[in-house]
From Swiss-Prot:
Its cofactor is pyridoxal 5'-phosphate. This is Cysteine desulfurase. Gene3D superfamilies: 1.10.260.50, Aspartate Aminotransferase, domain 1, Type I PLP-dependent aspartate aminotransferase-like (Major domain). It catalyses: (sulfur carrier)-H + L-cysteine = (sulfur carrier)-SH + L-alanine. InterPro entries: Aminotrans_V_dom, Aminotrans_V_PyrdxlP_BS, Cysteine_dSase, PyrdxlP-dep_Trfase, PyrdxlP-dep_Trfase_major, PyrdxlP-dep_Trfase_small. The lineage of its organism: Bacteria, Pseudomonadati, Pseudomonadota, Alphaproteobacteria, Rhodobacterales. Keywords: Iron, Iron-sulfur, Metal-binding, Nitrogen fixation, Pyridoxal phosphate, Transferase. The keyword Cell membrane does not apply. Its EC number is 2.8.1.7. It comes from Rhodobacter capsulatus.
Length: 384
């Protein structure tokens, strides 16, 4: 009898909660109006959007739902934040990013550097993924428009509120790509100096194709998309009401369950990680004291991570070779290189990312199957 598949790639995307799917359906067939319309159908859609905005604001601890600007996802939110900061910070033509940002930030920065003459400071990290704080502070000046530092990577999380305060001391705005962090870390943005934050619904059991940019009240802003007056004139384009309603409900559910879920998930993660490390020939990546509760990233020595992924997939187990946004490349990811993972292990990086759906029985099956796979893939020692 075929066993059910096991999904351990929740940092790439998550299963949409059934309640979320059910909540979205009426907005396709009954409350299908344009939220900008002045009749009853538009009003119903507008109510759905307001409820979603309130839920997202509550999840991240924003001071007001008016600080939430809906977008098509994290990439749009990131691009909007950085381009806006450069536009409103007159005369400041430098930005600060980390060496381990998402490609959406890295490629935008490279484009700004090449085509618009923006100077980009790329701050390195150490072998645990911790930001070089001295280099960050040295890069801050009255020429910097914005510092954009990811809140959590697939392997670690950073002291973002502290970094925001230091950016403000230099007169710079602060943005954080929190796509991997929202729903996995408790947040209270109202108590921080963070100016802008990006999030994406599909990372916390909402639908794909929707996200948001948190924009702190009073922060100067220049829209990226112009045209209609949607999102209080800050983002043109008819809102995807069904998906945004779904993201809002996902935010409600995750916020209500976060403390209990994260505790249970971290316990399962630690058990899985201990079991794999006990097999030998691998090392844990990231700062064990500051990382996402659901994530276990390991580097296997002298083993190709793509081969591990393929063999586990054949057994019905889904994992990732680090980051799904970079998988398929035949070279170590930029994060692996930035963390100076030893050459013999750099091609063996795999990521197990759990969710509230993950069970101990599923992880037991992984631990039962993995030793045989590693034995097949590990080179046979040469004897004299």
């Amino acid at each position: 009898m075929t066993q059910p598949a096991i999904y351990l790639d929740n940092n790439a995307t998550t299963r949409v909660f059934p309640e979320v799917v059910a909540a979205m359906l009426p907005y396709f067939t009954e409350h299908f109006g344009n939220a900008s319309s002045g009749h009853g159908f538009g009003a119903q859609a507008g109510l759905g959007l307001r409820k979603a905005r309130l839920a997202v604001a509550a999840l991240i601890g924003a001071a007001s739902e008016q600080e939430i600007l809906f977008t098509s996802g994290g990439t749009e939110a990131n691009t909007t934040a950085i381009r806006s900061a450069l536009a409103v910070q007159d005369g400041r033509r430098e930005i600060i990013i980390s060496a381990v940002e998402h490609p959406a930030i890295l490629m935008l920065a490279a484009d700004l550097e090449k085509t618009e003459g923006v100077r980009v400071h790329r701050i390195p990290v150490d072998h645990l993924g911790r930001l070089d704080l001295a280099a960050y502070r040295a890069a801050l000046s009255d020429r910097v428009a914005v510092a954009s530092i990811m809140w959590a990577n697939n392997r670690y999380d950073l002291p973002v509120p502290q970094l925001a305060a230091e950016a403000h001391a230099a007169g710079a705005l602060f943005h954080t790509d929190a796509v991997q962090a929202v729903g996995k870390l408790p947040m209270s943005l109202a108590d921080t100096e963070i100016d802008m934050l990006s999030l994406s619904g599909h990372k916390f059991h909402g639908p794909k194709g929707v996200g948001a940019l948190y924009l702190r009240k009073g922060v100067a802003f220049r829209p990226l998309l112009r045209g209609g007056k949607q999102e209080r004139g800050r983002r043109a384009g008819t809102e995807n009401v069904p998906a945004l309603v779904g993201m809002g409900l996902a935010a409600e559910i995750v916020a209500a369950r976060m403390a209990a879920d994260l505790s249970r998930i971290a316990t399962l993660r630690d058990w899985l990680e201990s079991g794999i490390l006990a097999l030998g020939g691998c090392q844990r990546l990231g700062d064990p004291a500051n990382r996402l509760a659901n994530t276990c990233t390991l580097a296997f020595d002298r083993i190709d991570s793509e081969a591990v992924l393929t063999k586990l997939a054949r057994a019905g187990i889904a994992i990732s070779t680090g980051s799904a946004c970079a998988s398929g490349a035949m070279e170590p990811s930029h994060v692996t290189r930035a963390m100076a993972v030893p050459f013999t292990a750099a091609h063996g990086v795999v990521r197990f990312s759990l969710s509230a759906d993950t069970t101990a029985a599923e992880l037991s099956r992984v631990l039962a199957i993995l030793p045989e796979i590693l034995a097949e893939l590990r080179p046979v020692p040469v004897t004299a």
